[in-house]
Amino acid sequence: MKYDLIIIGSGSVGAAAGYYATRAGLNVLMTDAHMPPHQHGSHHGDTRLIRHAYGEGEKYVPLVLRAQTLWDDLSRHNEDDPIFVRSGVINLGPADSAFLANVAHSAEQWQLNVEKLDAQGIMARWPEIRVPDNYIGLFETDSGFLRSELAIKTWIQLAKEAGCAQLFNCPVTAIRHDDDGVTIETADGEYQAKKAIVCAGTWVKDLLPELPVQPVRKVFAWYQADGRYSVKNKFPAFTGELPNGDQYYGFPAENDALKIGKHNGGQVIHSADERVPFAEVVSDGSEAFPFLRNVLPGIGCCLYGAACTYDNSPDEDFIIDTLPGHDNTLLITGLSGHGFKFASVLGEIAADFAQDKKSDFDLTPFSLSRFQ
């Protein structure tokens, strides 16, 4: 059988692409080296932020707004346990923070619902937070967090129900191109399609080592908290920048545990297989201490944690482009630790590509040619 589309990597973007492409009537094969959702990529750990006024640049705002619409649609399939939780997101940092300047600019350009607070205003609204006098907060009322593993599980189930073929726990070992399309090699045999999507996270380096993607081991951890830090008490998700420039992110507490991670830093690795578990690097459990001591002093000890992997591009912007020399193969990689919130819209973009539809978005900033 020759498929319309083969998806290599069925984590966040791949799961979404499988669903949207199958729903569009295409004959699709989803593949993954493991059984998604799983612990081997970048999507585990239960939750991911979704921010609209984007500190990484306003070029992302049209994408994230469409992503939000798609997340809302997906959440309707899990009304008892919604995939999107509108907790709000407070972005904290020095008044001269470049990241916060981008958040404010994005909000102004796209007329987003963002409230600016000074240090006293932040601490009055959320007494659990402590910030210096020179700090400001930009509160995104309509933002919040996503249940990442539930989202992937839902997409995969919906795709399967729609007739999508799924080949999991079966790594793709090679990709070949010829006049008839794309062929993948696996332990289960060879499969052919007219087009392919490669969205395998850091595993992309095993198939396409020439791509400018650097795997980086990252960790996040859960710390002892209480009901004051919960959504029920209106405690928000957050990003926070320390005076030295270190960037952190976190979520409201659930079951008396607050999850937090450090966005910058980490350990450079050469392949996804080199990632060691949480606590095998001495700094893992204490990485968030500088932020917790200064900003959330009421949070207690580290309870447990996990390691994940960023697939960093050189400029930490996404790579969304066809494979050089092969217009029938779309790459979605280099998501650099801020990609999950876009998984829905990136999956839709992939499905449009498979149908020969022109994207509704300007993808020029994400072209591989910027690295030449």
From Swiss-Prot:
Question: What is this enzyme's class at the first EC digit?
Answer: oxidoreductase
What EC number(s) is this enzyme filed under?
Answer: 1.5.3.-
* One Pfam family named in its UniProt record: DAO
The alphabetical list of record keywords is: FAD, Flavoprotein, Oxidoreductase
Record's cofactor remark: Binds 1 FAD per subunit.
Q: From the UniProt record, which GO molecular function terms apply?
A: flavin adenine dinucleotide binding; N-methyl-L-amino-acid oxidase activity; sarcosine oxidase activity
Name the chemical reaction catalysed here.
N(alpha)-methyl-L-tryptophan + O2 + H2O = L-tryptophan + formaldehyde + H2O2
Write down which residues bear the modification named S-8alpha-FAD cysteine. Answer: 308
Q: Which family does it belong to?
A: Belongs to the MSOX/MTOX family. MTOX subfamily.
Assembly state and interactors? Monomer.
Functionally, this protein is described as follows:
Catalyzes the oxidative demethylation of N-methyl-L-tryptophan.
Specify the protein name. N-methyl-L-tryptophan oxidase
- Show the taxonomic lineage: Bacteria, Pseudomonadati, Pseudomonadota, Gammaproteobacteria, Enterobacterales
